[in-house]
Curated annotation (Swiss-Prot):
Subcellular localization, as worded in the UniProt entry: Cytoplasm
Binding positions for Mg(2+) per the UniProt entry: E44, D120, E123
Pfam family, one: Ribonucleas_3_3
Enzyme class, UniProt record, top EC level: hydrolase
EC number(s) recorded for this UniProt protein: 3.1.26.3
Identification of the protein by name: Ribonuclease 3
Length: 238
């Protein structure tokens, strides 16, 4: 096993057999280009169920007074593509994307940082962990990796809309409405956008994406983290 892959396993806090880990990292684009190898989609299916059950159970016990509808909204703020991608990007140096096995086409179009691909990869790895170690180990891994999002669930919008969540946070702290400065580079068919979020004349985060929306969401995510929401939900000062 290469050191980079061991670093990924260290981020999850588990060991996996080489064959199972490789399968969990194999995107269908890579499998297609290599003669129809097995893909990580079955593991993704399994991991999605394990993640949903674990988060649902945790929220049920954390919030005994919440209604079914409220619990569903809290779960939606944690179990969604953007939340999974957020965790994936912060796993280790370079995030999950650098470990994924992608086809040339996906690689050339930035697939290693596409939220949907990162989310699918997270679910497939969680499925692999469940398959090899069982539900209790998988549960512990999920609660550790998603713990800060679980803590912050009451402050997040459904679908982890970082711009909305950041605006709600700054409003609650009397910091006004965030503004975004967006620039772009590259030809029309392959533009790259950079967004910087400013709150009270101070830059709190930046993000790069293949669309203005993606760049702004990443910038808002960085700003939300910079304001210590993830490190201390409920703080009233920066």
């Amino acid at each position: 096993m290469t050191q980079p892959r061991q670093a990924l396993l260290d981020a999850f806090g588990v060991d996996l057999p080489d064959e199972l880990l490789s399968l969990a990292l194999t995107h269908r684009s890579y499998a297609y280009e290599h003669g129809g190898l097995p893909t990580n989609e079955r593991l993704e299916f399994l991991g999605d169920a394990v993640l949903s059950l674990t988060i649902t159970d945790e929220l049920f016990h954390r919030h005994p007074d919440r209604s079914e509808g409220d619990l569903a909204k809290l779960r939606a703020s944690v179990v969604n593509t953007q939340a999974l991608a957020y965790v994936a990007r912060n796993l280790s140096d370079g995030g999950l994307g650098v470990y994924l096995l992608l086809g040339r086409g996906e690689t050339n179009t930035g697939g290693a940082d596409k939220s949907s691909i990162l989310a699918d990869g997270m679910e497939s790895l969680l499925g692999a962990i469940y398959l090899h170690h069982g539900i209790e180990v998988a549960r512990q891994v999920i609660l550790r990796l998603f713990g800060t999002l679980l803590d912050a669930a009451p402050t997040l919008g459904a679908g982890l809309d970082w711009k909305t969540s950041l605006q709600e946070l700054t409003a609650a702290r009397g910091m006004g409405v965030p503004s975004y400065v967006v620039t772009s580079t590259g030809p029309d068919h392959d533009k790259e956008f950079t967004a910087v979020v400013v709150v009270m004349d101070t830059e709190y985060g930046s993000g790069i994406g293949h669309s203005k929306k993606e760049a702004e969401q990443k910038a808002a995510s960085a700003a939300w983290k910079a304001l210590d929401v993830l490190g201390g939900v409920g703080k009233t000062s920066v």
